[in-house]
């Protein structure tokens, strides 16, 4: 459930707050910020295709989610650095890759994992449970990240997302390693 909640915490947190970030960090107007934000979900399609392609090579959903979270962590770190003068183009590129990777994780936890575990648990129930965890992450990001931004700024918001992503990466890779050692 950690993977699902953190996935939408990052994905929907950025979708919700990107217009404000672009306006405050880079001085973009409201219209430009909104239009650029509307493009982010398009990267989700590529995230779904990426998850399918990676699933051919990495069959363990824990490891696959962990690998995607490693990528998310690097991109979030890059996003943090881009706020220090790298420019809006690099920031938008990183936001696109982050969106792609977050959608890939979402596919892993709401579709691939339940199918992989179908012999042990009702896959429909598990998919619904994971989907509900994604909504918990979305809700936490909408309110929580706004509060953090108001109190400590956008760098703190990205650091919180980065911490959650690193924790998820470590959990996924560790769980995959424990499973293999059995």
Please provide the spans of the model-predicted regions.
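Extracytoplasmic gate region of multi-pass secondary transporters
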Residues: 1-51, 106, 110, 141
């Amino acid at each position: 459930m950690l993977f699902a909640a953190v996935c939408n915490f990052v994905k929907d947190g950025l979708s919700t707050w990107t217009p404000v970030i672009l306006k405050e960090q880079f001085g973009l107007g409201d219209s430009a910020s909104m239009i650029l934000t509307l493009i982010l979900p398009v990267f989700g399609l590529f995230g779904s295709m990426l998850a399918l392609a990676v699933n051919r090579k990495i069959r363990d959903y824990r490891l696959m989610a962990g690998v995607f979270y490693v990528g998310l962590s690097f991109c979030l770190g890059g996003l943090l650095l881009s706020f220090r003068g790298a420019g809006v183009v690099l920031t938008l590129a990183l936001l696109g890759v982050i969106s792609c990777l977050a959608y890939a994780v979402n596919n892993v936890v709401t579709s691939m994992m339940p199918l992989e575990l179908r012999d042990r648990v009702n896959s429909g129930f598990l998919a619904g449970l994971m989907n509900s965890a994604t909504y918990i992450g979305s809700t936490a990001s909408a309110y929580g990240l706004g509060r953090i931004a108001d109190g400590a700024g956008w760098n703190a918001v990205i650091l919180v997302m980065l911490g959650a992503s690193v924790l998820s990466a470590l959990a996924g890779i560790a769980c995959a390693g424990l499973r293999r050692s059995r």
